[in-house]
Amino acid sequence: MLFRSGEGDEEEALLARGANFQVPLYSCLAGFVEPGENLEQAVAREVFEEVGITVRDVTYVASQPWPFPNSLMLGFTARYGSGDLVLDEKEILDAKWCRRDELPMIPGSISIARKLIDLWMMRG
């Protein structure tokens, strides 16, 4: 989950709608680690590839086994570094910075993405 300071220093989170989502669901960015990368590098690369943003302060939060495709999901937070939203339209239909009081439809409680969103909500 990616954060930045918004208007009046109110924190905002970046949520995205994946190209494969059947419903208008917004979630955290996600991806896979490539050979030769550490986890922090993978987070930075995936964010940049999907939305054109650089990140800083990448921090591990939690993990979750995921049955498809037999993966281990790793949840991280990161702070906005620089850049404007430039979407990889093959993977991302939409992305937006959201305040806590304006969340779109988000994943259900069983997902690690929801855990990251809930932790962010509790911090506010």
Where are these regions (language model features)?
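Conserved hydrophobic/aromatic beta-strand scaffold that supports enzyme active sites
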Residues: 15, 75-77, 97
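Nudix hydrolase/Nudix homology domain
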Residues: 22-26, 88-124
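Active-site-adjacent beta-strand/loop module that shapes the phosphate/pyrophosphate-binding cleft
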Residues: 64-87
